[in-house]
């Protein structure tokens, strides 16, 4: 006997299925489920009178043969697709994406449930990979709480606290600071990787930072990003398989953008602030988007272009870069970096996939908890202003959604050599997962899973008789406590440092994972974000032309994912 359910009834019971569409928060973005891995009539669901019970959806298999945790009937949104599936977690890693249940009595089971299996109900929820923010100024450790609660599970950058150098640059300079920061990383339930200071014209000061545990090096104009420093830094990176991030020369003191590109010599580099106002060669840093060896990112303060963007930026810039508004040269420096035309073009370059990544620039002009929000606000603004992307139709925005989710998940992972561990929802990867109610997508996660264990969740009054009574807010869960913390989060280091035995020497508790493949990744590898246009920026008007087309758009006066979500 079969029972026919309406699509609405089915979605309310088991979540959306193939052909169903989901609105992302209060945006104009719609995603459509492309495939359902579960079988109609054989879905598993936990609860009184439901399927996952002994002898029904739960098998007699031992712990070795079943998942540790199954997220049931979830909609996965990732760069590779938008599908409905059960997600299996085993030993802190994603074990399978498919159909869960009892293989003794159910057909098509690819994930066995047993007495050793915990269940997280994913019905009606969207699951994304944990976000990766690659532009972190480690000014205050409390940033980590904000980032984790927003859905970011990996932070890469540099710093030592609220030192003047860290306020402006993402560098953890020298072996002593590197050791201290790696020791501090043991206390936080998030994946961390640190960049050393790359501004030197001889190799030894850079190599010793890589040996001390840096996953890469950061070149910043405030420390002197000259062609000689760039060349030396990239040479060391090539020798150690680490990445270089660069904030280029806003004042064009040591050369124009062409001189910087020439110093790259075709070698892979992650260009921070490839944007309209964040810094770097004024006014034409955007030109590097067209280089095959350049992996470009921008930061969230200009995302997206709104009627308030310009006014906000001047004061931010003066504080972050230790400038004095009473000094004419400092004021001119600040004003040269804030250009409405290039900010507007930045929106479009993100939408067309020329800008491959988006990050925060935390407490140094950017907001650490708003990477994900501002990514999707940009996607919404571009859909409203520019319409559907090629590859999307009238029914959904699937391609645009895949393009934008890749900007803060898989592409940063590929860039910094950590994609073998994080950055996507794929079997074998570390189980860093973010669960969202669709109405709150991109704004307020329902739950953050770190290394297979719940780290942060919206939780009600701990003294209540059930979990839901007010006040409901984000609270740290058991993955953030005791020895579980070190077993559910990773610290990324160089292979050189791992071989040197820094784990034992520094007394580290977290698992150290070496970065790899940093020197072979190119713009072509940036998933859904690999466009290499020929860009020209008019030095007088700042108009941006890409492959012959003028890139311009109006500032937004109203945005979704904003005030209505933050009344309390």
UniProtKB/Swiss-Prot annotation:
CDD domains: Urease_alpha. Carboxylation allows a single lysine to coordinate two nickel ions. Its main location: cytoplasm. Disulfide bonds: none annotated. One of its GO terms (cellular component) is cytoplasm. SUPFAM superfamilies: Composite domain of metallo-dependent hydrolases, Metallo-dependent hydrolases. Signal peptide: none annotated. Substrate binds at residue 220. InterPro entries: Amidohydro-rel, Metal-dep_hydrolase_composite, Metal_Hydrolase, Urease_alpha_N_dom, Urease_alpha_subunit, Urease_AS, Urease_asu, Urease_asu_c. Residues 130-568 form the Urease domain. The modification N6-carboxylysine is found at residue 218. It catalyses: urea + 2 H2O + H(+) = hydrogencarbonate + 2 NH4(+). The active site is at residue 321. It comes from the Bacteria. Ni(2+) 1 binds at residues 135, 137, 218, 361. Its EC number is 3.5.1.5. One of its GO terms (molecular function) is urease activity. It is found in: Cytoplasm. Pathway: Nitrogen metabolism; urea degradation; CO(2) and NH(3) from urea (urease route): step 1/1. Its cofactor is Ni cation. Belongs to the metallo-dependent hydrolases superfamily. Urease alpha subunit family. Heterotrimer of UreA (gamma), UreB (beta) and UreC (alpha) subunits. Three heterotrimers associate to form the active enzyme. HAMAP family: Urease_alpha. This is Urease subunit alpha. It comes from Burkholderia pseudomallei (strain 1106a).
